[in-house]
Amino acid sequence: MSQPIPQPPGLPLLGNIKDVDPSNTWLSLKKLSEKYGEIFQIKVLGKTIVFVAGAALAEELCDEKRFRKFVGGPIVEIRYTVHDSLFTAFDDEASWGIHHRIIAPMLSTSMLADHFTEMRDITNELMEQWKGLGANNKIAPLGDLNRLNLEITTYTLEGKRLNNLTGPEHPVIKAMEDATSEAIKRPTRPGIFNWLFYGGKLKSATKTLRAFGAELVQYRKDNPTDRRDLLDALLTAKDPETGKSLTDAQVIDEIVTMPIGSSTAPCLLASAILFLTQNPDVVTKARAELDAVIGSGKFEYAHLTQLKYVEGIMREALRLSFPAPGFNIEPIPNAADKKPVLLGGGKYQIAHDQAVIIVLAGVNRDPEVFDEPLAFRPERMMGEAFEQLPAGVKKWFGNGKRECIGKHWAEQFNMVVLTQMIRDVDFEAVDPGYKLVQDGWFNVRPIDFHVKVKPREV
């Protein structure tokens, strides 16, 4: 017989409205997962929301024969900006398949090899910038890494340099932050409040983002090239199944979606810097690997697969920082079967149409899987140790057919930047006691984390 899903005590009529802070939702869910374990639920104004924070249940929910991505809440809200793009399309929208078949080949590992040099050289510009800051500097690495992410995303995928590493911040960065932060907050407010008091923020951000996309489209049309990149495919390719191509509006949808999707990367890398400042022995081991593999020569694409310890650092940073903090799942609808859906071999049950949010703050730190789950240990993310981990704790990029289409791009970007940071510069935390602080944004990121940076001492 199924047992009740744990739930915090609530208020009459209002339910658990005080248990989740709408201005910092993921931090609230992290705390609830630490208290209630593998599964819990809340009820707000009569609506039930179920959360899974255990690795075994998360793996079960990733069975695509039983469950699928649920497009709801913030994802529906961001459709105002990007419509039925890859990230936001409903499961039954034909546009998802058309867009996916056009885009996926351009983000494959074989195509990304062509972009390695671009990633490396632009990252080197930031390293040189950091090395030239002089004594007693203080930087917030997240800000510089956001700039780097936009610069590399735009150049590798759309073929245009923004020269955004210095000078005023590109307006797209703030617009992207405004649009996504508003998307995550809108479902927590009454609709009339969104219309009366908050509509302008999303509209303004959307206008900036779509103008940026339109500029890139026009730039390519005005400057024809034989460059084979994502923008070329968006503008010229036809879906091999339907023969359809994308309209300019749909092209802009996907251009805007790309930096939103890749925004997890600077969050991860800033967190990785934090973990490295806290674990100098990890830096020593990584540099020994880098010196053995690359030496004093030029960092080349062929080196990436040889950097096993650096890859372990990246994966362990993904596990502990969970920059994309969760994803939504729902049972696959079946009009002929309205029975409750069983989880955990019948230990729990949910309604046939109940959406579930997987909370990676819990899943990635499940003590049933990880010994000392809060410790930063790259070794557990390497080789056989990594292969033996359950699939449920490797869902940093989502799951199945709706997994992040830019996964390989993100992994290569993260490896390139992480390698060059460890190889070229030394970081010192301004506040050695800093703890990971979240601010309620779309992604989890280290807020108000500052470091001193200088050329690596050899």
Regions found by a protein language model. Give the residues of each.
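Cytochrome P450 heme-binding "Cys pocket" and the immediately downstream C-terminal segment
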Residues: 280-282, 389-390, 402, 407-446
